């Protein structure tokens, strides 16, 4: 779900053609320890045109590197070396009076960048001053200001973006190399009858003199010159560069600089997305401009005071694979405002029409994204308590994010707090948590193992044919679910590690994330 404004309805994208003039030619709520010289591209394994599926079974579970992936380029950081003039990478429409609106390409002087994710800036163009989201700008005349530079994104994330069937052959981006410090990688979409849509990666090496090259016979003084050259000549690449890879605007960190507790009147509920035991989820808008998802909780579900206290902690959890908490209405009925994810809950996505086309590599990629988000939760010493497919949200390009972290602890419903009632997710809950209320990150690991069965069975309810009481009794006596049909034994072995009786013997999420990456992530061409 990436947020987008209601004007326009879809997420804003940016794309710039590099064709030379003389050429001819593309929800959630309802529903590091471990246990135990011609350019030679490193081609992506054969995908089909549907969703960029990889046909060949991956080396371990998935032939993807999904460590800490992102849905938009990482661009601006803290000011360094006295640089105070930045350029806008996207249009930004201010949502409150203290913010500053600007257009893509506008030059901005940074007045103060000490307040985290929102900087005080002065527009050279309009003469106005206000707060801007720091991830919408980059230092002027820097590589970060180039549309084709995507910074520190992973190989797998570049493939997820480039394998969009709407991209023409030659769509490209430049990113940091994952394997060589100081080097870059040129990732280019290609197509042929044998492999279908695929991505090739070329390592861009740096000369001692400061220049760049893919092959030593053709060298350039800057990355900009390299891109301009290969936009006119393939010269050993799979195809000359045609279009910059499109990407959505990044999420701002919060709705605005000081928007946290907001009035109910500022929200408009438009389309109901789902309903559950404790409330509903709506697609809506904030301040008439900003597309958001809104969770409405039934009165009595939780104490407003306890919720507000927990929300103060939750809003500090920021990771690319966690759904962002934007704002709250803290008086009953409580409203929770989060980023809008266009494809809804993972459970509904798996059971729906799109789920039919998902193959193992994509399912494992989704699992790795979830593990990445949970590894961050683990590092922050937080506990989710209700990790399951219904609480994972899906956006464009199969991006998955963890939602509803921490809310389960606050629910005051007797049928839920008894941990035996119909509303309590027994089938996803570790035995020590279900029986004794011992919720830890290790009970989240157990739940992740159950979530893996949901992925591999396209949303089947765990322990089919068994009631909650029977599940609790049999699991306590040592029963574990067998390997699902068409699930590799290696993946079932990972599930089994998550279901070890002793919580301390279960793996960490850091370990799980690593196991869901390819056995070797080296990029031959890099």
From Swiss-Prot:
Residues 16-25 have a biased composition (Basic and acidic residues). SUPFAM superfamilies: Protein kinase-like (PK-like), SH2 domain, SH3-domain. The active site is at 386 (proton acceptor). The modification Phosphotyrosine is found at residue 416. Residues 148-245 form the SH2 domain. ATP binds at residues 273-281, 295. Its EC number is 2.7.10.2. CDD domains: SH2_Src_Src, SH3_Src. Keywords: ATP-binding, Kinase, Lipoprotein, Myristate, Nucleotide-binding, Oncogene, Phosphoprotein, SH2 domain, SH3 domain, Transferase, Tyrosine-protein kinase. Residues 1-59 are annotated as: Disordered. It comes from the Viruses. The phosphorylated form is termed pp60v-src. InterPro entries: Kinase-like_dom_sf (IPR011009), Non-receptor_tyrosine_kinases (IPR050198), Prot_kinase_dom (IPR000719), Protein_kinase_ATP_BS (IPR017441), Ser-Thr/Tyr_kinase_cat_dom (IPR001245), SH2 (IPR000980), SH2_dom_sf (IPR036860), SH3-like_dom_sf (IPR036028). Residues 267-517 form the Protein kinase domain. This phosphoprotein, required for both the initiation and the maintenance of neoplastic transformation, is a protein kinase that catalyzes the phosphorylation of tyrosine residues in vitro. Homodimer. This is Tyrosine-protein kinase transforming protein Src. It comes from Rous sarcoma virus subgroup E (strain Schmidt-Ruppin). The gene is V-SRC.
């Amino acid at each position: 779900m990436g947020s987008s404004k209601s004007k326009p309805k879809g997420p804003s994208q940016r794309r710039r053609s590099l064709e030379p003039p003389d050429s001819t030619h593309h929800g959630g709520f309802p529903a590091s320890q471990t246990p135990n010289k011609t350019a030679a591209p490193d081609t992506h394994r054969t995908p089909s045109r549907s969703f960029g599926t990889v046909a060949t079974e991956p080396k371990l579970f998935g032939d993807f590197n999904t460590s800490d992936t992102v849905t938009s380029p990482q661009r601006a950081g803290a000011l360094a070396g006295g640089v105070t003039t930045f350029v806008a990478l996207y249009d930004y429409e201010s949502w409150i009076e203290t913010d500053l609106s600007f257009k893509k390409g506008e030059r901005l002087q940074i007045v103060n960048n000490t307040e985290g994710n929102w900087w005080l800036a002065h527009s050279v163009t309009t003469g106005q001053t206000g707060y801007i989201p720091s991830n919408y700008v980059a230092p002027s005349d820097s590589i970060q200001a180039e549309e084709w530079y995507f910074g520190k994104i992973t190989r797998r994330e570049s493939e997820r973006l480039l394998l969009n069937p709407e991209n023409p052959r030659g769509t490209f981006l430049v990113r940091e190399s994952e394997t060589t410090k100081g080097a870059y990688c040129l990732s280019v979409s290609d197509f042929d009858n044998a492999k279908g849509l695929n991505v090739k990666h070329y390592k861009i090496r740096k000369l001692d003199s400061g220049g760049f090259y893919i092959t030593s016979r053709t060298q350039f003084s800057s990355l900009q010159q390299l891109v301009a050259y290969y936009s006119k000549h393939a010269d050993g690449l799979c195809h000359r560069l045609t279009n910059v890879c499109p990407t959505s605007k990044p999420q701002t960190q919060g709705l605005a600089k000081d928007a946290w507790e907001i009035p109910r009147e500022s929200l408009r509920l438009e389309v109901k997305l789902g309903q559950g035991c404790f409330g509903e989820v709506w697609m809506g808008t904030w301040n008439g401009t900003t597309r958001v998802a809104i969770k409405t909780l039934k009165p009595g579900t939780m104490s407003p005071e306890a919720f507000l206290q927990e929300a103060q902690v939750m809003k500090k959890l920021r990771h690319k694979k966690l759904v962002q908490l934007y704002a709250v209405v803290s008086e009953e009925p409580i409203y929770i405002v989060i980023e809008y994810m266009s494809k809804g809950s993972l459970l509904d996505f798996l059971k729906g029409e799109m789920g039919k086309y998902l193959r193992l590599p994509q399912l494992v990629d989704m699992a790795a994204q979830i593990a990445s988000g949970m590894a961050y939760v683990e590092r922050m010493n937080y506990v989710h308590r209700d990790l399951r497919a219904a609480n994972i949200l899906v956006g464009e390009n199969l991006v998955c994010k963890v939602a509803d972290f921490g809310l389960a602890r606050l629910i005051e419903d007797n049928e839920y707090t008894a941990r035996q009632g119909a509303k309590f997710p027994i089938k996803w809950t570790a035995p020590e948590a279900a029986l004794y209320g011992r919720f830890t990150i290790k009970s989240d690991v157990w739940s992740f193992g159950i979530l893996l069965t949901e992925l591999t069975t396209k949303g089947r309810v765990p322990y089919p044919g068994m009631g909650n009481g029977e599940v609790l009794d049999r699991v306590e006596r040592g029963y574990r679910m067998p390997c699902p049909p068409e699930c590799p034994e290696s993946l079932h072995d990972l599930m089994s590690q998550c279901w070890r009786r002793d919580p301390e013997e279960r793996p960490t999420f850091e370990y799980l994330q690593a196991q869901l990456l390819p056995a070797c992530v080296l990029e031959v061409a890099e």
